[in-house]
UniProtKB/Swiss-Prot annotation:
InterPro entries noted in UniProt: DUF4166 (IPR025311)
Protein name: Uncharacterized protein YndH
Pfam families: DUF4166
Length: 205
């Protein structure tokens, strides 16, 4: 059975083999990785104060720094709607505290797109577009967004959204994945930026 990413990634065949394996997330394949964010930055004082609220939803945080250890876990889950979801659970280890960035992605069969639900409980919903490039990298960009309140989806105007661009590659020389994430707003500029590397954890046989 093909994963939701095989269905939705534009030019999936161009992905580096390691990235193809990484995104082959289905009932039989999970992914666990550990790494270091060389930089976590971005956001004015006001933005960072607002991001503090995200801690209660396990999706945003205001801490910034360099060389921050982190883990990432992806696994499938069966939702009440009988859809298959992919959990994205990221943990960042700052000095004396942990911060979380959790999300759930599902495949929208009707629109042939990925829907990304941020937070636990879900706070924000975004449409994501995935596209592979000739160099084997993967670019993920966000589209339309909704605020989730009391089971309702409230469309957000563009000036209130955080537009994200993610670039993920595999560095053969260093034998690791690289990640760079940039989230910005048309009025406030950069809200959040991080970049780093990670490796897949060895599974117990």
């Amino acid at each position: 059975m093909s994963s939701i990413y095989e269905k939705s990634i534009i030019n999936y065949h161009l992905l580096h083999p390691k990235l193809q394996k990484r995104y082959q997330l289905d009932g039989s394949h999970t992914f666990s990785g550990t790494g270091t964010m060389s930089e976590i930055s971005g956001g004015s004082f006001l933005v960072r104060m607002l991001l503090k609220l995200g801690v209660f939803f396990r999706c945003f945080f205001s801490e910034r720094g360099k060389d921050i250890p982190f883990t990432i876990q992806n696994r499938t889950c069966l939702l009440k709607s009988q859809h298959t979801g992919i959990e994205w659970n990221r943990t960042f280890f700052f000095k004396g505290k942990k911060r979380f960035f959790d999300a759930l992605m599902i495949y929208d069969e009707k629109e042939n797109r990925i829907l990304d639900f941020f937070g636990k409980p879900h706070l924000l919903l975004s449409v994501l577009t995935f596209e592979a490039s000739l160099d084997g990298s993967l670019t993920i960009t966000s589209g339309k967004q909704w605020l989730l309140i009391c089971g309702k989806r409230i469309p957000l105007p563009k000036w209130l959204t955080g537009t994200s661009e993610v670039c993920e590659t595999f560095d053969e020389k260093k034998n690791c994945f690289t990640i760079e994430v940039h989230v910005q707003n048309t009025i406030l500029g950069t809200l959040f930026f991080y970049k780093g590397t990670f490796q897949e954890e060895e599974r117990e046989s």
